[in-house]
UniProtKB/Swiss-Prot annotation:
Protein's name according to its UniProt entry: Protein ORF3
Region annotation Homodimerization, and interaction with host AMBP/bikunin: where it falls in the sequence: 72-114
Annotated GO biological process: symbiont-mediated suppression of host innate immune response
Region (Interaction with the capsid protein): 48-72
Motif mapping: PTAP/PSAP motif: 96-99
GO terms for cellular component: host cell endoplasmic reticulum membrane; host cell plasma membrane; host cytoskeleton; membrane; virion component
Amino acid sequence: MGSRPCDLGLFCCCSSCFCLCCPRHRPVSRLAAVVGGAAAVPAVVSGVTGLILSPSQSPIFIQPTPSPPMSPLRPGLDLVFANQPDHSAPLGVTRPSAPPLPHVVDLPQLGPRR
């Protein structure tokens, strides 16, 4: 994972970005020739979605774009939980606003099947 010189004599940090001139990412270097001098082009390279950044004549890097935040399954529940105070009660102590738990009914144990 360390930085090693790429074909242009620059250092490639393969852990954070994909240097298109790096020998490790040689199949991707064809994309750099197609893109040319584009400023920021969305691309999918070996399953990673990112932006191709080429600020100047330097080699083109693809930095992965952050994934969008996960939306809650039920949008109304986040408002309900946001209004509740964040006081943690000791174990075994219930809040007065909490609904009572249903009574547990013991079921008869079944004998071993034959």
